């Protein structure tokens, strides 16, 4: 796909990366890609950790338009959503994301607010409140 679209100078596949090294690689990316085939409810309804990694790094991303991604994107506008994982959709989405500087800058800026809201420090408060209510 990379060679067929002459993107060797723009796309670098790093292979397997140790979790401890992932953040230092992620912050160097221009755009993130969070794509899963719709081959079951698990993929269709879940949110990938990398989705949040890109947000925390302030990196706009390309995501397939599944409900959880759409819901967060409607709130924060941090990703370009594509209808499916066909080659044409991925190529068109990436080209659009990479060529529209205004969109890219807006998504990048929006990641800041999303990062402030979507993190463990905020989720911890919600979880503690939940348990306090549960315990009465």
What are these regions, as identified by a protein language model?
Residues 24, 89, 102-133:
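A charged, aromatic-enriched C-terminal amphipathic alpha-helix characteristic of glycosyltransferases
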Residues 1-23, 31:
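Nucleotide-activated donor-binding/catalytic signature segment of Leloir-type glycosyltransferases, i.e.
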Residues 27-30, 51-60, 64, 76, ...:
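Conserved donor-binding/catalytic loop of nucleotide-activated donor transferases
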Residues 26-44, 59:
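Acidic donor-binding loop of glycosyltransferase active sites
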Residues 75, 79-87, 96-101:
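Conserved acidic donor-binding segment of nucleotide-sugar-dependent glycosyltransferases
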Residues 20-23, 45-57, 67-71:
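Short alpha-helical segment that forms part of, or immediately flanks, the ligand-binding pocket
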Residues 17-18, 47, 65, 86, ...:
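Short loop/turn segments at beta->alpha junctions
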């Amino acid at each position: 796909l990379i060679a067929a679209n002459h993107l060797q100078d723009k796309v670098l596949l790093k292979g397997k990366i140790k979790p401890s090294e992932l953040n230092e690689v992620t912050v160097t990316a221009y755009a993130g890609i969070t794509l899963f085939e719709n081959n079951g409810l698990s993929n269709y309804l879940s949110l990938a950790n990398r989705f949040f990694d890109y947000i925390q790094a302030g990196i706009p991303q390309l995501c397939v338009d599944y409900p959880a991604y759409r819901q967060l994107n409607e709130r924060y506008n941090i990703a370009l959503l594509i209808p499916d994982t066909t080659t044409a959709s991925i190529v068109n989405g990436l080209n659009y994301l990479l060529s529209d500087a205004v969109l890219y800058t807006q998504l990048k800026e929006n990641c800041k607010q999303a990062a402030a809201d979507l993190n463990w420090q905020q989720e911890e408060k919600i979880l503690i409140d939940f348990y306090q209510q549960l315990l009465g």
